[in-house]
Amino acid sequence: MHSTAWAEEVKEEKGIILIDPGHGGIDGGSKSKNGTVEKDINLSIALKLKKALDNEGYNTFLTREADTELSKSKVKDLTMRCDMKKETKCDIFISIHQNKFPKESCFGAQVWYADNDNSLNFAKILQESLRKNVDNKNKRLEKPAKKQYKILRDGYDGASVILECGFLSNTNEEQKLKSDDYQEKIVYAIVQGINEYMKK
């Protein structure tokens, strides 16, 4: 009994992470010309990330664990995801997404961050970890969300970011994003980034 309680206490001390697999259910998110749907990749990466962070000793939560929306209303769905930050008292909120752009040559993961120092600091660390561990040709920089991304504009004090893992509009990157090996590389980069941020 005591050992279990102690383990949970230690787990909480390591940090609380809320993982948000973007979209879900009736909301598929972006779709590639080959028919790849964003929501499925988001969930696949998020589930792998939860497992990896659990193994690291973090206390982790998911906003969704299956192909479901939190509400049929888009506004309510996003509000419910934001509310989970306060409910879990998370140190880090990371929303997993995939990008899409008319220009097919665009590639590379990019981090968007909420308007606070915790988010900026984590975004810088995470963007560098993605460059180092996933693709050193990726010259993208972390960007402030400003008026974009409602999920980052709720005023939460913890580190809140959206990670666009890559571009479904780039055929080569799309194929990578669908593969378990590449998803594991992304997960590894995120875990390294979280570990570095949580040390500070």
Residue spans for each PLM region:
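Boundary/activation segment at the start of structured domains
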Residues: M1-I17, P21
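Active-site-proximal helix/loop segments of hydrolytic enzymes
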Residues: W6-E12, T36, D40-K200
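Short glycine-rich His-centered loop
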Residues: G15-G35
